[in-house]
Swiss-Prot record:
Listed name of the protein: DNA translocase FtsK
Phylogenetic lineage: Bacteria, Bacillati, Bacillota, Bacilli, Bacillales
Residue ranges crossing the lipid bilayer per the database entry: 34-54, 63-83, 99-119, 137-157, 158-178
Gene behind the chain: ftsK
Gene3D superfamilies cross-referenced by the UniProt entry: 3.30.980.40, P-loop containing nucleotide triphosphate hydrolases, Winged helix-like DNA-binding domain superfamily/Winged helix DNA-binding domain
Gene Ontology terms: cellular component: plasma membrane
Cytoplasmic side: 179-788
One of the protein's GO biological processes: chromosome segregation
SUPFAM superfamilies for this protein: P-loop containing nucleoside triphosphate hydrolases, Winged helix' DNA-binding domain
Length: 788
């Protein structure tokens, strides 16, 4: 029986399992999933207004819920997912919170719409509204929709508009509480704590401000008390009103001021003071006249006592006319650089930079006489050094001889890439001076044209000294000739004087005989050192004149002389500017380096105010020629093409001159400039120089100042030496053009000490140069010298 019962119960269990499985199969109907997917698709179409169906769905929800329809979309999607997977309608706390939030948003949307445009009494039917919305392809603002409209329409008469606002806030708070599972008590507690914290911080800030104000008030009160204490400590001074005869203001005479004169006329009680003031003013005028006469006498005495430039009889030549620009050749028309070719190279440049990962654009192109500058604007984040390192790659891509990169261009957020032109355009001195001729500044000289093609002229008196250096054939001598010719075209002989030193003997001899020269062109290196010392003496004499005349510089002194000549009807000569030009400094430094360096140092340090300006040129820019003393005292420099970056640094302090093209291509650094200016130098032919010199000489002959001429060099043959072999050693060294102690030992079979003494005597008598390490000594006298 027991076994039969067990079998029957087992059969019942299997039958119940079958029934539940069949029910599950019935409940797992796939139609539910299809409906869920369809609802999701329709909601997505409605949210994004996709097609006709999407637009109709969104119009329908807009009509019912207004702006709150987007929450409705979310709630429908969440409810669909919940029903699909849990197979029941959601009856949870979050469901109630979502419904409350939907109602609150209906109120909010309708309230916003109400405050903006007021309540509308009528609504269109749903179908007509949907059709109209689709037909006009727009979705008008319906606030909270039909539901929000009727909710507000029913609530306002019952609890007023203010009550509706309060109910809306409560609904929003309730929905948040239901969704987050927080009780009202907790929310209120957190809100109260936040409010208390805010009020606490506010009170702290206010108390801090009050304390600061209190401290300021106390500080002001303390300062006032200190002021009163100081006033009490000072001796008591009677009030101004107690003095009847003394005016309230001090009667300080201001000469040349009409107000004091009017006061003296209307106040008879001050007759004595006015009389004293008039006497003192007369005394001052008389004292000034006496001082002027004394100054004139001192000037005459200084002129009479010293041998000066004016003593040479330099008279202002009224009939002298500066040479016209027509003496210079008219520049010939040259073929301009093709703009299409330049633009093509700019595009190639951009592509090349892009190939190497540099994002940059060509923003501007400047076509100059010798080079074309491409302004590159790098993108944000691009390092400038990355562009500079592509120097060789850019030159290769553009098929250029060399490329100079200026990174960045001073004063601009751009990088300049200078590419040589296929043909250098000739720049003439006439076209450079044409715009500023004649110049008011007598020392205005023309250099050439810059990268933009603009003419560059610079005043020598603002430089105030100039260093010109470059290798042979780079255009250095042409630049010197252009500077001298510019002075001849601007200044008369009594305005500017020149001293030319040319150890090479061939560059500046053409200027012999012009009236602007102080002395003939100096070609002997020994005389050159003495000539520079004469300039130093002239500088000291001028400063002595400035001291006696109470002037500071040559400009003030000349103005004083002109004023005296007008008042006293005299003809005192004005001081002319002096420009000293040394064409080859290296030769002078080898012969008399110490004397030349000392003279150049004194001239460059002090001669600016005296109207003396120095131009030094050399083709060997080494540190033993351009020493640190010379370099530091000559702020303006011109660098022509050099062979190495070291030479460029010696001249202008930075590299760049080694990349110049030659033929007048230069880098100019002015006084106070932080960057170089690339200039194509102005060309001047020998015939043009000769024409200007002939024009000047025909009007006035040279009147040299004998006192400025250097002394004749000492005859080396007359110098005595204690050694009997000195004359033979002298002739031997001059014939062989080399000298050393061992050579004299072998030639004359003498000991080392005697040979060393002979070498010292030869060096002292300036037959050989000083010793320079392991290098052989230079013989300073050749066989062509008559003294030998």
């Amino acid at each position: 029986m027991a076994q039969a019962k067990k079998k029957s119960t087992a059969k019942k269990k299997t039958a119940s399992k079958k029934r539940t499985n069949s029910r599950k199969k019935k409940n797992d109907n796939p139609i539910r999933y299809v409906i869920a997917i369809l609802v999701v698709v329709l909601m997505v179409l409605g949210v994004f207004q996709l097609g006709i169906i999407g637009r109709l769905i969104d119009s329908f929800f807009n009509y019912l819920f207004g702006y709150s329809r987007y929450l409705t979309y979310i709630l429908v999607l969440l409810a669909t997912g919940f029903i699909t997977y849990s197979k029941r309608i959601p009856k949870t706390r979050r469901t109630a919170g979502s419904i409350v939030l939907q109602i609150a948003l209906l109120f909010v949307s309708q309230l916003v719409f109400h405050f903006n445009s007021g309540i509308k009494a009528e609504r269109e039917p749903v179908l007509s509204y949907v059709y109209q919305s689709y037909q006009h392809s727009h979705f008008p603002n319906f606030g909270g929709g039909v539901l929000g409209f009727y909710l507000l329409e029913l609530s306002v008469p019952l609890i007023s508009l203010f009550g509706v606002c309060i109910i809306t806030i409560l609904l929003l708070c309730s929905s948040v509480i239901l969704l987050t599972n927080h009780q009202h008590r907790d929310v209120a507690k957190v809100a109260l704590e936040n409010i208390k914290a805010w009020f606490g911080s506010f009170n702290e800030k206010m108390s801090e401000r009050n304390q600061e104000k209190q401290l300021k008030r106390e500080e002001k009160a303390r300062l006032k008390e200190e002021q009163k204490a100081r006033q009490n400590e000072q001796p008591q001074i009677k009030d101004v009103s107690d003095f009847t005869e003394v005016p309230q203001e001090r009667d300080i005479p201001i000469y040349g001021h009409t107000e004091n004169e009017s006061k003296s006329q209307c106040q008879p009680s001050r007759k004595k003071r006015v009389f004293d003031a008039e006497n003192s003013s007369n005394n001052i005028v008389n004292h000034q006249a006496d001082q002027q006469e004394q100054l004139t006498e001192q000037t005459h005495n200084s002129v009479e006592s010293e041998n000066t430039i004016e003593e040479a009889g330099e008279v202002t030549n009224v009939s002298y006319v500066v040479p016209p620009l027509t003496l210079l050749n008219q520049p010939a028309k040259q073929k301009a650089t093709s703009k299409a070719e330049v633009q093509r190279k700019g595009q190639v440049l951009e592509n090349t930079l892009k190939d190497f990962g540099v994002n940059a654009k060509v923003t501007q192109i400047k076509i100059g006489p010798a080079v074309t500058q491409y302004e590159i604007q790098p993108a944000q984040g691009v390092k400038v050094s990355k562009i500079v390192n592509l120097h060789n790659d850019i030159a290769l891509a553009l098929a250029a001889k060399d490329v100079r990169i200026e990174a960045p261009i001073p004063g601009r957020s751009a990088v300049g890439i200078e590419v040589p032109n296929e043909k250098i355009s000739l720049v003439s001195l006439k076209e450079v001076l044409d715009e500023k001729f004649p110049s008011n500044n007598k020392l205005e000289v023309g250099l050439g044209r810059d990268i933009s093609g603009d003419p560059i002229t610079v005043p020598l008196n603002e430089m105030p000294h100039l260093l010109v250096a470059g290798s042979t054939g780079s255009g250095k001598s042409v630049c010197i000739n252009g500077i001298i010719t510019s002075i001849l075209l601007n200044a008369k002989p009594h305005e500017v004087k020149l001293m030319l030193i040319d150890p090479k003997m061939v560059e500046l001899n053409v200027y012999n005989g012009i009236p602007h020269l102080l002395i003939p062109v100096v070609t002997n290196p020994h005389k050159a050192a003495q000539a520079l010392e004469k300039i130093v003496a002239e500088m000291e004499r001028r400063y002595d004149l400035f001291q006696h005349s109470s002037t500071r510089n040559i400009k003030g002194y000349n103005e004083l002389i002109r004023k005296q000549n007008q008042e006293l009807d005299e003809k005192q000569p004005e001081l002319p500017y002096i420009v000293v030009i040394v064409d080859e400094l290296a030769d002078l430094m080898m012969v008399a380096g110490k004397e030349v360096e000392n003279a150049i140092q004194r001239i460059t340090q002090m001669a600016r105010a005296a109207g003396i300006h120095l131009i030094v040129a050399t083709q060997r820019p080494s540190v033993d020629v351009i020493t640190g003393i010379i370099k530091n005292n000559i702020p303006s420099r011109i660098a022509f093409a050099v062979s190495s970056q070291t030479d460029s640094r010696t001249i202008i302090g930075t590299g760049g001159a080694e990349k110049l093209l030659g033929k007048g291509d230069m880098l100019y650094v002015g006084n106070g400039d932080s960057s170089q200016t690339r200039i194509q130098g102005a060309f001047l032919s020998d015939q043009e120089v000769q024409d200007v010199v002939n024009y000047v000489v025909e009007q006035q002959q040279a009147n040299y100042v004998k006192e400025m001429e250097p002394d004749a060099p000492v005859d080396k043959s007359e110098m005595k030496s204690e050694d009997a072999l000195y004359d033979e050693a002298y002739l031997f060294v001059v014939e062989q053009q080399k000298a050393s102690t061992s050579l004299l030992q072998r030639q004359f079979r003498i000991g080392y000490n005697r040979a060393s003494r002979l070498m010292d005597d030869l060096e002292r008598n300036q037959v050989i140069g000083p010793q320079k390490g392991s290098k052989p000594r230079q013989v300073l006298i050749d066989l062509n010298n008559d003294e030998v």
